[in-house]
Amino acid sequence: MTLNRGGKMGLSVKRTSIISLESRMELDKKGVGVDLGGKKLKDLLENANKNNNKNNKTKCKDEELKSENISLEEIKSMHQYCLDELNWQGINSIKPPFDINSDGPNKIDALEKYESFQPGFLFRIFKFLEEKKKRELLKDIEIAEMKDKALFGDYEKISQLSLRVLNGDLDCYFQVIDEIRPFDRLLKLGSEVEIGTNDSGSMEVEFKVNSEKVIPKSRFNKEISGNDEEVEITYYEMIEEYVCSSILFVAKNIMNIIPVNKVVVHAVDNVVDIDKGAKNDITILSIVFDRETLNKLNIKTVNPIDALDYFICNMRHQKASGFKNVDRIVQY
């Protein structure tokens, strides 16, 4: 294990991207991932699942969240809101919706309606009504063909994307993260996330806690009773729980949507730097999550602080004064 002495800010990898609520990720124009034709990946996955094995399902929806409405209990329980895992092997094995050399389901249905049309009494008297109805049914066949073409096109997009993800295509990794937006829950609270990687087996994250924004002392003091010292200690404990819960949330969400085996998270916050004696943005936690160990944890019930003991981790937290600066783990 190699350390970055002093916990220098920024990621030590070649490919990075800042995740923002206001804008989409700036993907490398030379490698644009898979063209989804303006459609959302979530919608394509949900549509594909309707006609295939239920075991391949995914729930990518993120509940609406506003920091002023969320309780302090929820803030320290971020790890309980992880996305379901995307089974890329299962997605890649999804069968085509129909044989491309044959008529699709929509056209078959439209043709059946056209061929089974039997003019009634009025149609036989007023021939123009019969002709009008037949034109409508023929138009429905054309529309059905377009629907089938779009249906097969969606299948091809998902098939191509899943194959490239399984092959470790970094452009597609970033595209999936940009489309599914696994960190929005943290971003809505006021934290920030930057991701990066050098290879297809790992992802590195700088998690900017912004604790004073997420848990303002003014709000905390109103909701927590006790003397000043007790409230101060409880406040620092709350920040510790939020940070540990959030890094579990970050690592688990990344591993749930892209097939990396390691996620390295560096948590940064504006706290007193003991080396400089003044408040500064410093690394307060650095941890290496491996997939095998993380998968063994019951993410819904685990104590996030205790969970860190299972991983290579640098963290210093004092009961009366909170987090202290630590060295970053840069080789893992």
Indicate where each model-derived feature is located.
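Long, charge-dense low-complexity segments
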Residues: 2-19, 23-28, 33-332
